[in-house]
């Protein structure tokens, strides 16, 4: 049984060589358990919107999430504590 989903730098829209980017938002929208998405403020793959059961936290940096690893870790730790599963 899946209790929750953690997405670190979820690739919402992969850059393509031609044509419009294909969104993967439907994949996130299909998740029914609590979900945390941690995304860099300059992530070239896009930033998904928050939704029911989905928290989106923006941290400094890009898709690599390397600029502020402490912020990423603290965000995840706080979310896990709040879940209490």
Regions found by a protein language model. Name each.
Residues 18-22, 48-49, 69-70:
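Conserved strand-to-helix beginnings and helix N-cap segments that scaffold or border functional pockets
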Residues 39-40, 44-50, 66:
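Conserved alpha/beta-hydrolase "acid-adjacent" motif
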Residues 61-75:
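Catalytic histidine-centered segment of alpha/beta-hydrolase-like enzymes
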Residues 75-83:
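C-terminal alpha-helix
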Residues 30-32, 37-39, 58:
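Short beta-strand/loop motif that positions the catalytic acidic residue
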């Amino acid at each position: 049984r899946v209790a929750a989903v953690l997405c670190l730098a979820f690739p919402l829209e992969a850059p393509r060589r031609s044509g419009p980017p294909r969104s993967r938002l439907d994949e996130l929208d299909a998740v029914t358990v609590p979900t945390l998405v941690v995304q860099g403020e300059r992530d070239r793959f896009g930033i998904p919107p928050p939704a029911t059961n989905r928290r989106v936290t923006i941290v400094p940096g890009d898709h690599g999430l390397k600029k502020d690893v402490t912020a990423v870790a603290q965000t995840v730790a706080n979310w896990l504590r709040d879940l209490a599963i």
